[in-house]
Curated annotation (Swiss-Prot):
<dbReference type="InterPro" id="IPR014510">
    <property type="entry name" value="Tellurite-R_YeaR"/>
</dbReference>
<dbReference type="Pfam" id="PF09313">
    <property type="entry name" value="DUF1971"/>
</dbReference>
<dbReference type="InterPro" id="IPR015392">
    <property type="entry name" value="DUF1971"/>
</dbReference>
<dbReference type="InterPro" id="IPR014710">
    <property type="entry name" value="RmlC-like_jellyroll"/>
</dbReference>
<protein>
    <recommendedName>
        <fullName>Uncharacterized protein YeaR</fullName>
    </recommendedName>
</protein>
């Protein structure tokens, strides 16, 4: 199983979602901001099950990685990976946490300083 590097920092968590409350785009193939370089998403399932499908690229017909995450389990996904998820039961309840490399956080802090320096 993929592991989050020990020095990565937990930066945010989504709310807990079910099939009805999760953003629709999460169920479609996507490459989102949460999977940029240096960011590991961790999906945790509280009830039901979620299937993660990872793809080699935007156009691959078949996934190259499939992970079934059941209640009480979590899975870590690689940065920069095209993917989608499927809620496997009507009562599935899950959330996603994001862990970021310290250098990525520093880059973001430097960019904010430049943007907000008043010049």
């Amino acid at each position: 199983m993929l592991q989050i590097p020990q020095n990565y920092i937990h930066t945010r968590s989504t709310p807990f979602w079910n099939k009805q409350t999760a953003p629709a785009g999460i169920f479609e193939r996507h490459l989102d901001k949460g999977t940029r370089p240096g960011v590991y998403p961790r999906l945790s399932v509280m009830h039901g099950a979620v299937k993660y499908l990872g793809y080699a690229d935007e156009h691959s017909a078949e996934p190259d990685q499939v992970i079934l995450i059941e209640a009480g389990q979590f899975a870590v996904f690689p940065p920069e990976k095209w993917h989608n998820i499927e809620a496997m039961t009507d009562d599935t309840y899950f959330n996603i946490d994001f862990f970021v490399a310290p250098e990525v956080l520093m880059e973001g802090a430097q960019q904010r300083k430049v943007i907000h320096n008043g010049k």
